[in-house]
UniProtKB/Swiss-Prot annotation:
NCBIfam families on file: L29
SUPFAM superfamilies the UniProt entry points to: Ribosomal protein L29 (L29p)
Name under which the protein is recorded: Large ribosomal subunit protein uL29
Keywords, ordered alphabetically: Ribonucleoprotein, Ribosomal protein
Keyword Ribosomal protein among UniProt keywords: yes
Biological process according to GO: translation
GO molecular function annotation: structural constituent of ribosome
Encoding gene per record: rpmC
Amino acid sequence: MNAKDLRDKTVDELRDELANLKKESFNLRFQQATGQLENTAGIKAARRNAARVKTILNEKAAAAAE
């Protein structure tokens, strides 16, 4: 997922995406704790994707406030 695709989404879609990423991040951390996680890079990717979504949400909020 890249920032260009995220900017095309609505605020509600971004919030849904953020909720999904948080769930995914939780599941990945849980798998790591139980020793079932094979691809540890997924944790970093999920965290960065969540940060991208939050950044776009903040940009949209700032644009709406102006």
